[in-house]
């Protein structure tokens, strides 16, 4: 799984594993349902075991991240923060899309719900500073009936942005609105 978590928009799929590309193709085109389900379970088990959730941004060793936490997202720090915010973005969104397709193809039992919840939580936790993953992750968790984890993801996303001293209300508003909807049972 060399680099599947590090795929970036525009040039990344060339460097992805064949399994990754197959999962993307099958999800987008809605084909090979049984093969997709089996391949996804195998792929996600391997991805999660070989790449712990903090392996992508190595938070404790990231000097730029530590500077941002100390100084906040002001001035040129926003420029330096972009690589942190975008880390894992493509793959996290693909994991959510794959999980959504898997959920639609599988029986809605406790085992499937637990497996899908595990994958969605992994997709978000790969980079908790990427607020663009939190809302679709929470949406899917709520749709499969896991409101508790959906709420936790949104609360973590808001706390992570506050940890970075991010003052951009465009970041907070969708997170807060989705959290309100989940708290009010409107999903």
Please describe what each predicted stretch is.
Residues 1-187:
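Oxidative protein folding and maturation machinery
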């Amino acid at each position: 799984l060399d680099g599947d978590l590090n795929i970036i928009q525009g040039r990344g799929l060339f460097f992805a594993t064949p399994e990754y590309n197959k999962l993307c193709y099958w999800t987008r085109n809605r084909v090979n349902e049984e093969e997709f389900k089996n391949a996804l379970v195998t792929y996600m088990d391997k991805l999660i075991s070989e790449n712990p959730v903090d392996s992508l941004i190595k938070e404790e060793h990231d000097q730029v991240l530590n500077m941002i936490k100390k100084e906040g997202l002001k001035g040129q720090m926003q420029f330096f923060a972009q690589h942190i915010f975008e880390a894992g973005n493509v793959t996290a969104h693909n994991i959510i899309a794959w999980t959504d397709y898997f959920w639609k193809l599988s029986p809605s039992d406790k085992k499937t719900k637990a497996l899908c919840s595990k994958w969605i939580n992994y997709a978000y936790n790969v980079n908790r500073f990427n607020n663009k993953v939190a809302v679709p992750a929470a949406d899917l968790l709520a749709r499969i009936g896991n409101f508790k984890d959906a709420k936790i993801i949104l609360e973590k996303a808001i706390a992570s942005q506050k940890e970075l001293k991010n003052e951009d209300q465009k970041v907070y508003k969708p997170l807060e609105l989705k959290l309100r909807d989940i708290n009010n049972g409107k999903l």
